[in-house]
């Protein structure tokens, strides 16, 4: 900020453009790991749903069509063996807009608090969402294993905290957080926990986990089809959890006009019901990671842990 108002900083990925020209000169061309666009094809059934939904004429419901919310509901049951009431699930326009805009809506809900806590090593949109909402972005230091070091949150920051973000598996580290500990900390300090779980299908150690395993009170989980289904271009996601928070966000987002296009929602239904393609994609990613780990280990002389 300055005396003339907010001046946006350089967009993180735009800052890499200067390096792309040099990288492109290498034999084999550039390997772009910046934004993380999926490079594999989505399911043909998903593509077919886009052109046959007949939902392009009308305005789509902001909370998501019932089949999409039901598909999210049954996916949560299949994946995590827990039941979240349908009323506590709603659509979002991919995950990024939810990450960036939610602090603004939460600030309207609880104007007495002004701080957004987020992982120190993380997706840059957590901090920017706090800034754009007029809140204080406060990075929480990481533990040696890559989770949130809750002991490093000051009493003042905890008292002022509007919300805390958790990201597990982490982007960019892949680390798994202690979800139970974060949820317990949030409840102790009356701070809603927002759990970004967009990479849960690509959990390499143990079974996929969600913060909702510890109950929905004070917890909202965020999911996206961008990576799991190679649909980053459709912008389809959903959030689920605490009844009061989800209801509030649903109502505010209706007024804002946050709507996933109807055909994209129809495609999302097909994608959420398709576990086979996701399993295949996870296998592809794991093989690529294992090969990358071999190359990096040989180059660096250090063991690389997936």
Regions found by a protein language model. Give the residues of each.
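PLP-dependent aminotransferase class I/II
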Residues: 218-221, 225-305
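Helix C-cap/helix->beta junction micro-motif
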Residues: 23, 133, 188-189, 299
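A short helix->loop->beta-strand "cap" motif at the edges of active sites that frequently abuts
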Residues: 114, 188-192, 217
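PLP-dependent aminotransferase-like
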Residues: 104-167
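N-terminal small-domain helix-loop-helix segment of the aminotransferase-like
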Residues: 2-94, 101, 271-272
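Active-site phosphate-binding strand-loop segment of PLP-dependent enzymes
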Residues: 143-207
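Hydrophobic/aromatic ligand-binding patch that stacks against planar heteroaromatic rings
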Residues: 128-130, 185, 211
């Amino acid at each position: 900020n300055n005396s003339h108002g907010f001046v946006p900083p350089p967009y993180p990925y735009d800052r890499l453009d200067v390096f792309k020209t040099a990288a492109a000169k290498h034999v084999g061309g550039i390997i772009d790991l910046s934004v993380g666009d999926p490079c594999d094809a989505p399911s043909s059934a998903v593509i077919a749903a886009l052109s046959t939904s007949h939902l392009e004429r009308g305005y789509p419901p902001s909370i998501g069509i019932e089949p999409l919310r039901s598909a999210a509901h049954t996916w949560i049951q299949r994946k995590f063996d827990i039941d979240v009431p349908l009323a506590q699930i709603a659509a979002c326009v991919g995950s990024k807009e939810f990450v960036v805009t939610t602090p603004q809506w939460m600030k309207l809900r609880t104007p007495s608090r002004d701080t957004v806590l987020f992982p120190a090593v993380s997706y840059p949109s957590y901090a920017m969402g706090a800034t754009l909402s007029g809140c204080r972005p406060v990075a929480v230091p990481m533990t040696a294993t890559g989770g949130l070091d809750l002991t490093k949150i000051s009493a003042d920051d905890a008292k002022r905290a509007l919300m805390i973000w958790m990201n597990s598996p982490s982007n960019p580290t892949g680390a798994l957080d202690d979800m139970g500990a974060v949820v317990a900390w949030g409840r102790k300090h009356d701070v809603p926990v927002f759990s970004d779980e967009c990479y849960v299908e690509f959990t390499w150690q143990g079974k996929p986990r969600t913060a909702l395993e510890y109950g929905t009170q004070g917890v909202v989980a965020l999911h996206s089809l961008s990576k799991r289904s190679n649909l980053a271009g459709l912008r389809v996601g959903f959030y689920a959890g605490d009844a009061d928070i989800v209801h509030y966000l649903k109502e505010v987002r209706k007024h804002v006009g946050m709507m996933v296009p109807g055909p994209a929602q129809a495609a999302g239904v097909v994608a959420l019901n398709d576990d086979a393609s996701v399993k295949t994609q996870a296998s592809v990613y794991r093989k690529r990671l294992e090969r990358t780990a071999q190359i990096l280990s040989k180059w660096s002389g250090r063991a690389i842990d997936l």
